[in-house]
Amino acid sequence: MANKNAESSSQPPPHVQPNQQQQQQPPIANEQEQEPHGDTCSIPPAQSGNTDSRSRGGNTVFKSGPLSISSKGIGWTSWKKRWFILTRTSLVFFRSDPSAVQQKGSEVNLTLGGIDLNNSGSVVVKADKKLLTVLFPDGRDGRAFTLKADTMEDLHEWKAALENALTQAPSASHVMGQNGIFRNDHADPAVGVDEKKDETPTKSTVLGRPVLLALEDVDGAPSFLEKALRFVENHGVRIEGILRQAADVDDVEHRIREYEKGKNEFSPEEDAHIIADCLKYFLRELPSSPVPASCCNALLEACRTDRGNRVNAMRAAICESFPEPNRRLLQRILMMMQTVASNKTVNRMNTNAVAACMAPLLLRPLLAGDCEIENDFDVGGDGSMQLLQAAAAANHAQAIVITLLEEYESIFGEGSLSPGLYSDSEESGSGTEEGSDDEEYDDDDDGSQGSEDYTDEEEDLENESNGSYSESAASEDKYADSIDPDDHKINDNLSTESKSPKRSKEPKKLLSGSRRSSLPRHDDGKKDEDIVVKGVNNTEVKAVVEVSTSEDKNSSTSDVASDTQKPSKLSDAPGGSKRHWGRTPGKKNLSMESIDFSVEVDEDNADIERLESTKLELQSRITEEVKSNAVLQASLERRKKALYGRRQALEQDVGRLQEQLQQERDRKLALETGLNMSKGNQPIPETIDENLKKDLQEVAQAEADIAKLEHKVDDLENRLGHHDGKASGSTHSASKESRKLPEHNAKMKEKQKDTEAASTHISERSTSKDGQGAARENETEKQQDSRSKSSQQETSRGSSKLVGLSKRSGTKGEGSTTTTSALSKLTMRLNFLKERRSQIANELQNMDKGKTLGQPSPTSGQNRVSEETEKGSGSNQDPDSSKLQSPHILDRGRSENGGDRGRGSSGGNHPNTTPRTFSR
């Protein structure tokens, strides 16, 4: 009890409001009088009766300021800050400071609740948690209201102010009733009479129609209700808080009067909250309930069955007990509710919220107490029995509507219902309904105020079930406005019913069976086509009997009789201030223990709904993650395959390159071996290729040939020297020729240098020769060797002929000249072979440095072939050129000898010999 509070359990009592406005300090009172909405931000004038406790002059404001309130019992899961005003007789709270300027003209600052003070109360403070608890020993268990301050300073200030107010509060025995709250038995007829005297009651052409004409006019055109339903479906479903937030009563009445005057179409620019309240006002003013009492009993019995058979039982109940017009009207309203609930992400109205707003309008008899609800509440005689019955009835009504919404297709689908099954006996309604018709809507009746004992309770229950809704000030403050006092006719006549032995002995199982968590939930509502009302005239009347809230319970019957004489016009309500549906102050102080019975269901239900929504959200997230992971896995597999293939290709390349490197190393070794063969007899490695092996063998053969040629040259030189010695001793001219021989050798050396330069140029051009080109060169060299040998033989024969000729002519110098020519040829051949050897060495060095991996191009091969051809032709021309050079040299020698002889003949009378004789 210590942790409960008063926002819903203790509804703002009637006596708090008169005391609040008239007895506050002048500054606050003046600010409140400037508010544009009358009692929306202030307290209405004091009512007559109990003048000792409601005097206007002595009720001062001890303290006002913000405090936080919270209670698990009323569905709030966190502390909420409200503006409290403490007077001598009451502690009331508002959404915000009532003296502050309103931010929006459409928002109102109503009294959300309050408690009555008496001198029996006490204050308990928990400083560690900054909690402030007000205790009253009223009734059986007493009352306890817990508040929370922001700071320790505020905590102590509020404690002192509360203790001061309690000491000055009136005595509980003088001003309290059985429940410890002020009674408000009489209305104040003096207030607002001048404002209403000019208004003449007229019969409305829109309101008060029978159920048969609720959806369709006599001429078949859509009725006011049908147009309002379509407007909500088309334009109101995207408005936050539709059907929950209330519009001003005067605006609603003004729109209905405009409709009656000819403005019978709703434009999209109109306020959806006003049209929604017009819709609810129309249903409230129906002569009979949309669901008759007998049908409510049938639905109640069906709702008590287990979950598996509940839908079939409710379908059977509708088929057997519902009149056709009532069934069509119920279906049409449920379709609109489904449309609203299907847009819950936008309008923040889920199935529970829509059912909480519309169930009191659809199931009037159930909330009015005309249906039997099993209970075994034993709470004493303090009136808590009535409140528990009201809470149980509200829970059952909401559970029935939720089931109808969630199982709409199963209950009202194609083929589920047959018009022939309907009974016409229910259309006229019961006699009790007809007799109580005119008592349904009467603002002057005290029962309408007593009905608010459930109004604000349902507000907080709805706050709990709609935990995801915005907690903005406008939404929270306007929530209860959407519930009209007549939506929940929970009257004090329930006290007479509580005296019945039948009611007191009924089991308690119905309350636990009202848990909506046991109902199946399907948020996807489907719509049928619009329903056209057809059938016979319906003369049903309202079925709820209002009972006076007099302290004497036995006088309730006479109060009902007097109430039936009052007109059911909204304009007959006392006071000229604006009103909001569901905001007439209640007069019961519902204890926290009694609320726990009815609200515990909503707490569990909200928890289940939150868990289900969280589960669905997590499942959707898991599905998305699985899809993304599958895509990533596939990409990873493709990447692995690509890398594996790349790895294999690289391994193959590495193996091939290693083999090629080994081959090049072997070739290098073989070439080095070939270069070193001249130094010694080294074997050729077997690992080299055949072409290279042939090249090395040819080089070795060429070196052997060169060695032989050098040996022959040495022999020839020796012979030539020996022959020259003999020749010099025999003739003077031969000695002269021998003296000219060094000059001739010098010229021959110059020619050899030219030849070496040409050979060097040829070797540079042939650095890219392959094994095949080398083989061809070897063949050319062999040809050159054979030709050189033949030229040597010819030279020897020529020289021998020349020697014989010289002998015959007496000139010995010509033979020595021919020998010198042969020697020059051998020298040229030797130089060529040396150049070839240096060429091969250069090739080996280039191959070692460049790491050549491929075979030579065809172009290089062609170049080598052409170069070898040129060299071959050059070598073939060498013997001829030598032959040509030899006669030329001989001619020069003979000419010189002739000159000498000329000179000698001139000096010594020698005959002149023509050198041309031997040039041929």
Swiss-Prot record:
Biased composition (Acidic residues): 434-463
Gene3D superfamilies: Pleckstrin-homology domain (PH domain)/Phosphotyrosine-binding domain (PTB), Rho GTPase activation protein
Gene disruption: observed consequences: Male gametophyte defect characterized by sterile pollen grains developing balloon-like tubes.
Keyword Coiled coil among record annotations: yes
Ranges of compositional bias, category Low complexity: 17-31, 814-825
Domain Rho-GAP residues, every copy: 213-412
Alphabetic keyword roster: Cell membrane, Coiled coil, Growth regulation, GTPase activation, Membrane
Record domain PH: where: 60-167
Topological relation to the membrane, as annotated: Peripheral membrane protein
Descriptive protein name: Rho GTPase-activating protein REN1
Organism: Arabidopsis thaliana
